[in-house]
Regions:
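Flexible, glycine/charged-enriched surface loops at secondary-structure junctions
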Residues: 37-40, 171-172, 248-258, 284, ...
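Short beta->alpha junction loops/turns
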Residues: 45, 150, 231-232
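Secondary-structure boundary elements
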Residues: 137-141, 163-170, 191-195, 223, ...
């Protein structure tokens, strides 16, 4: 029923937006679900936005719930990390660089955007390599890149650190808040307050990791997962495959995004990451501390590690009152269940990070709520 997956070059995307194919998949999903109750979770910010844009939640069977999980790297960044980055901005002469979505995320008492308005030198970059250029142009000033993201963006950070070493840019460093996806999925699967019957697995992440790191979902929890693309037919195909596995009681990890994802991912990118980073424990917003779910810069590259290089006082962490971003991120509630949603918390005046990021669950729900 789904379109044949062509070679990566010269892809004709029209097949993945075909209304007839989409209708057939929707009808099949309705047939399979019947009067069952099935909860599926996507764990990719792009899927969050796409599901909202295409209105898929409103056309699914009544018993099929599509939940948003911890797929937005900005959203899962803990308040403590935001506060630490703000503290680094107070270093004399420091230049803080980061991606645009991080600017408005509230910390315990302020944000990077507010600190920039107050006179701190905080700059938006589109790549860590831009931060390297800034470091080269300002050799007498510390330039710190605040790095957040999952497996997709980590290789570029590793490459930037290696390039900084090659260019002798010792004034460059990275505040690393990177995370890895599989441990978070294990935490959700173990959460007694959530019931997830299947995972719409992130296509972007899987381009790096391949399929193997998600195998534990089946081995340990008998829960299926399907790596899914981002076009309408991609997503519907992934949902249909998951529902069929749930109904038939045959869980597996499958790939519905073969034009973008190889089963073994990108070994070269993974090797680059392993050269520069090592696993560490880290805290996720909503999920709390998760063992070996973060990445720390290896000791041999410690001169580029802003965490160990700069000893700065960080204020006591305070979570925003009433904000339920954490519950949204673990699938315990939907954004509309939060009492602040659409009232005191809007994209113009966000209380929590899920309303700040363009890929945040709350921002997507708000934008496509009608």
């Amino acid at each position: 029923m789904a379109p044949e997956q062509p070679a990566r070059s010269g892809i004709d995307f029209s097949a993945f937006r075909d209304p007839k194919l989409a209708r057939e998949l929707i009808e099949r999903i309705h047939e399979l679900v019947g009067d069952r109750t099935i909860n599926l979770m996507e764990v990719c910010g792009t899927h969050t936005v796409s599901i909202g844009r295409y209105g898929f939640r409103s056309i699914m069977p009544a018993g099929l719930k599509l939940l948003s999980g911890p797929g937005c790297p900005v959203c899962v960044t803990a308040n403590r990390d935001i506060d630490h980055a703000i503290a680094l901005a107070n270093i004399d002469g420091a230049i803080i660089t980061t991606f645009g979505d991080m600017m408005r995320v509230p910390g315990s008492s302020t944000s990077l955007a507010a600190q920039k308005a107050a006179g701190r030198d905080i700059r938006i970059v589109y790549s860590p390599l831009d931060a390297l250029d800034i470091a080269e142009q300002n050799p007498d000033r510390p330039v710190i890149f605040m790095g957040v993201g999952f497996e997709t963006t980590t290789p570029t950070i590793a490459a930037a650190i290696l390039e900084a070493e090659a260019r002798g840019l010792l004034n460059f460093s990275v505040y690393c808040a990177h995370k890895t996806t599989p441990p978070a999925l294990r935490a959700i699967a173990n959460d007694p307050e959530t019931t997830i019957d299947g995972f719409i697995l992130p296509g972007h992440v899987a381009t790096i990791t391949g399929l193997a790191p998600f195998g534990f979902l089946v081995d340990e929890f008998k829960t299926p997962g399907v790596v899914t693309g981002f076009e309408p037919v991609d997503i519907l195909q992934g949902i249909c495959m998951l529902v069929q596995m749930v109904v038939e009681g045959q869980p597996a990890i499958d790939n519905a995004y073969r034009r973008g994802v190889n089963a073994d991912g990108n070994p070269v990118a993974r090797q680059l990451v392993e050269q520069v980073f090592e696993p560490c424990d880290t805290t996720w917003r909503g999920l709390g501390p998760i063992a070996a779910s973060g990445l720390a810069i290896r000791p041999e590259f410690s001169r580029f590690d802003a965490r160990t290089r700069f000893d700065v006082p960080v204020e006591a962490t305070v979570e925003p009152r009433g904000c339920r971003c954490g519950d949204v991120l673990r699938g315990a509630i939907t954004p509309s269940d939060c009492p602040l949603f659409g009232r005191t918390c809007t994209p113009e005046h966000p209380v929590g990070p899920c309303m700040v990021s363009s890929e945040g669950s709350c921002a997507a729900y708000y934008r496509y709520r009608n």
